[in-house]
Amino acid sequence: MARLGNCSLTWAALIILLLPGSLEECGHISVSAPIVHLGDPITASCIIKQNCSHLDPEPQILWRLGAELQPGGRQQRLSDGTQESIITLPHLNHTQAFLSCCLNWGNSLQILDQVELRAGYPPAIPHNLSCLMNLTTSSLICQWEPGPETHLPTSFTLKSFKSRGNCQTQGDSILDCVPKDGQSHCCIPRKHLLLYQNMGIWVQAENALGTSMSPQLCLDPMDVVKLEPPMLRTMDPSPEAAPPQAGCLQLCWEPWQPGLHINQKCELRHKPQRGEASWALVGPLPLEALQYELCGLLPATAYTLQIRCIRWPLPGHWSDWSPSLELRTTERAPTVRLDTWWRQRQLDPRTVQLFWKPVPLEEDSGRIQGYVVSWRPSGQAGAILPLCNTTELSCTFHLPSEAQEVALVAYNSAGTSRPTPVVFSESRGPALTRLHAMARDPHSLWVGWEPPNPWPQGYVIEWGLGPPSASNSNKTWRMEQNGRATGFLLKENIRPFQLYEIIVTPLYQDTMGPSQHVYAYSQEMAPSHAPELHLKHIGKTWAQLEWVPEPPELGKSPLTHYTIFWTNAQNQSFSAILNASSRGFVLHGLEPASLYHIHLMAASQAGATNSTVLTLMTLTPEGSELHIILGLFGLLLLLTCLCGTAWLCCSPNRKNPLWPSVPDPAHSSLGSWVPTIMEEDAFQLPGLGTPPITKLTVLEEDEKKPVPWESHNSSETCGLPTLVQTYVLQGDPRAVSTQPQSQSGTSDQVLYGQLLGSPTSPGPGHYLRCDSTQPLLAGLTPSPKSYENLWFQASPLGTLVTPAPSQEDDCVFGPLLNFPLLQGIRVHGMEALGSF
């Protein structure tokens, strides 16, 4: 990389040398001020000389600040032929940058000239000027705070002069003291000082934007003397001197030699090494005293000590704290009260287990190194037999048969505590009653009782884990000195969810009462497990579940309720809350052939526990049931269709719009009146001739005219008669015509006969012949013949029925009676027509 950089620089220098006339000699930059306030505007101009013949006649001058091109340059040609570009930077926000005047040369910018711009602030006034006279170096050291950063090279100078007064009159000047770069302190040597005479001192700060001076300080160098701290050490023990008292330290120090001729005072500070205690200040120490006994300290405790001094009573400065000295105080005999309790073994009553607890009588009761249980035999003055020496809070020993009392003491290197007598007596006092216990929180138990009569002097309370973890060696006990107490809150060695045995014994003068015990849980636990679910019965949409409740557990809170949860395959959850006495539950509303996950939660006031998950699937519907359901559905659909059809058929206003009422001769009931072929010959009634034709109507065939019964404006159309008659074909109905019939749409006339009569009025019947152009049903039919009334052959009375006068002009009777070319009509009565 270094070689590559050197080659690049070499090529750049070579290219510049090869440029014609050297472009760098063509331009020159001038600025309004190279150093300005940060954020102030600055104006610069660049002039290109006329003798740069290798440039364009009108070169474009560009400006660049650092690496960024700056727009806004104003370019013009001067009278002497030179090109000038002027730019104004409104805000110079760079503390240091290069402004360049450039031209486009090829594909790159060629710098014609550049100038360095600086921006910053004028120096602030130096403050907190202070000076100290160091006797070790014999120099006056002054220091100050320079103020905020100026971003410009700033020089500081410590100036001073001598003065015989209060520095109002300036005397001889003292050589300026210039600190090193970056330092804010300076030393004036002793040769430039005049001791015991005032001098004026100040600091001057200067940079390119201005100058500032600190307030003047007037002082005597000896008034600002700072001494060096003395050397602190412990006092050597002397055979004649008494040993130091407990909690005391004997100290001495060696003063600083150059300051022996200066009057001074000192002070001491100390703190214990253990913990995070703060310094405690002791002083001032006695004048001209080089040793001191420091008391009131904790015994058998390590301390850290330091000392410092100051010129006194004249002005001066405190010295620094001396190096630390570590000392340990002496011990004191334990000052404690020992609360004792004892228990005899059942198998060996002379084996006694003694317990005790030290109770400090003072804030500093002394360190305890161990305990001694001793017995003084009667009749042996001064003889003490130790029974037990231990550092524990209990001891098991064999009690001599004649011993009824032992002594217990605590000891350390400084001595022993006051002996505590322990009297072994039988339980002859009254017992307390109604002992009870309850948990206050997971880490405490409240034990209460009713005191006996007379009041005891105190109580001994023991507690420890109950069965099956009971152990006499792990019991905790304490003594309650208040004989009128009715309860006590146990906080020591209490853990949650544990069964504890609590024993309370009343203490009397020279005796004690019988012990009473009670069991209690520090905190009841939630059920350890929930009952297991079992499937009893299951159907398509239901499932019957059952479970066996768990038996009550010691230390477990009683159940308050059950909650059963079931979840389907779509992860939809359902739940139901049941009483604690429930033994089963039926799930309803299940989906057939569906998978469900079910679990039971047993809850109490202490918490809840879930059972294992039971997975079941409901039954699938059988095939017969499915067929029944489909059959019922089909029957219902059929009934619906039938009802709809009947409704449409029975309602004329619904039927007529769907299809027209066009008669069908082939399926008409008229066809049943006359057989299709008559085997017998037609006979005529004797004595009767051809009935006269009373009226003939000729109908012309016209497709554009409506049928006669559909026309409402024809004068020939009238209402239907009260009695409908029949048409009779005159002639032999079996005769077959050999004449071909014209096709439909011709002008051939078809003759119709109309028989008019009335059942109520006797008289001869009337025939009505009509000419019709209506097309026949058959393609080719024989020509119409005369009509013969066959009614006379079937009439039992042999009389003719005459038509009603109002029916003589009727020729059209509706769509059911207008059938062309009927072979024969046999009237069997009016009842047949009534069915129409």
Curated annotation (Swiss-Prot):
Q: How is it modified after translation?
A: N-glycosylated.
Tell me where the sequence motif Box 1 motif sits in this chain: 658-666
The Fibronectin type-III domain covers 125-230, 233-332, 334-430, 431-528, 530-623
Bilayer-spanning residue ranges = 628-650
Q: Which GO terms describe its cellular component?
A: endocytic vesicle membrane; external side of plasma membrane; extracellular region; lysosomal membrane; plasma membrane; receptor complex
**Keyword Signal tagged:** yes
Domain Ig-like C2-type residue range list: 25-117
Q: How does it sit in the membrane?
A: Single-pass type I membrane protein
Asked if the Swiss-Prot or TrEMBL record annotates the protein with the keyword Transmembrane helix, the reply is yes
Q: Which body tissues produce this protein? A: One or several isoforms have been found in myelogenous leukemia cell line KG-1, leukemia U-937 cell line, in bone marrow cells, placenta, and peripheral blood granulocytes. Isoform GCSFR-2 is found only in leukemia U-937 cells. Isoform GCSFR-3 is highly expressed in placenta.
The record's function comment reads: Receptor for granulocyte colony-stimulating factor (CSF3), essential for granulocytic maturation. Plays a crucial role in the proliferation, differentiation and survival of cells along the neutrophilic lineage. In addition it may function in some adhesion or recognition events at the cell surface.
- Copy the domain comment: The WSXWS motif appears to be necessary for proper protein folding and thereby efficient intracellular transport and cell-surface receptor binding.
Q: Which PANTHER family match?
A: INTERLEUKIN-27 RECEPTOR SUBUNIT ALPHA
Record's protein name: Granulocyte colony-stimulating factor receptor
Organism per entry: Homo sapiens (Human)
